[in-house]
Regions:
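Conserved, single-site charged/polar hotspot
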Residues: 1-218
């Protein structure tokens, strides 16, 4: 279940295989994960606008997996896999490219969302040559960048005009929506505060649910 406003997690847990494969899980800093994926998915020689557009998509895809608890809600002890069949390519132990390292540092606190929503977009992408999809074409971004498209223009070309780039997103420790025990009357603290945020978010779609006036965790 979504956990209030999205944030940039300090770390992400990656499963080094297909979801059901007997493979190792590694917890890595989120920034290092994005740099690794970008260095594994795209080429550092591409135009900067293409690189930036792809990095926005990579960040957003990972945040969507974390925010929706796609794997954890299904009982898996990880946030994302390294399989391009399911997620995006993570190469355990690889070096990253210098310019991609710099661009990720500049863009890390930004993600894509659909206007009118708060959750990170499911920013699907593929290489656009051997594999095509309804989302972003990695090689297609190169041609658009060479035509003078900005990173945002490239993103709207593939994901539509109804997207925003959310900037200055805070970094915090990742927390699952279920604390591991039932909350009871009289409880207070961060778990209660998160539940209050969730209820207020749900009430946007179901107005009959009254909003909690002050989010205090008590």
């Amino acid at each position: 279940m979504p956990k209030g406003e999205p944030y940039i997690p300090e770390t992400i847990t990656v499963h080094l295989g297909r979801p059901d494969a007997d493979a190792m899980n590694v917890e890595v800093p989120f920034a290092d994960y994005i740099k690794n994926v970008a260095s594994s998915e795209i080429y550092p020689t591409w135009p900067e606008a293409a690189l930036r557009a792809n990095i926005y998509a990579i960040i957003t895809f990972a945040l969507n997996r974390i925010y929706t608890e796609w794997y954890r809600s299904r009982g898996y002890p990880f946030d994302i896999t390294d399989s391009t069949q399911y997620d995006q390519k993570y190469t355990y132990g690889r070096e990253v490219f210098e310019n991609i390292n710099r661009l990720v540092d500049e863009q890390l606190n930004t993600y894509i969302r659909r206007q009118g929503t708060i959750e990170p977009l499911f920013a699907a992408f593929c290489n656009g040559t051997t594999v095509t999809c309804e989302g972003l074409s990695q090689w297609g971004t190169v041609g658009l960048a060479e035509q003078g498209y900005s990173p945002y223009d490239i993103l709207t070309y593939y994901y539509g005009d109804s997207i925003d780039l959310v900037q200055n997103v805070p970094v915090q420790t990742s927390m699952q929506s279920y604390p591991g025990f039932p909350l009871e009357l009289g409880y207070s603290g961060e778990d209660v505060r998160l539940l209050q945020i969730q209820l207020n978010r749900i009430s946007r779609n179901y107005p009959a649910i009254p909003k909690i006036g002050e989010i205090t965790g008590s």
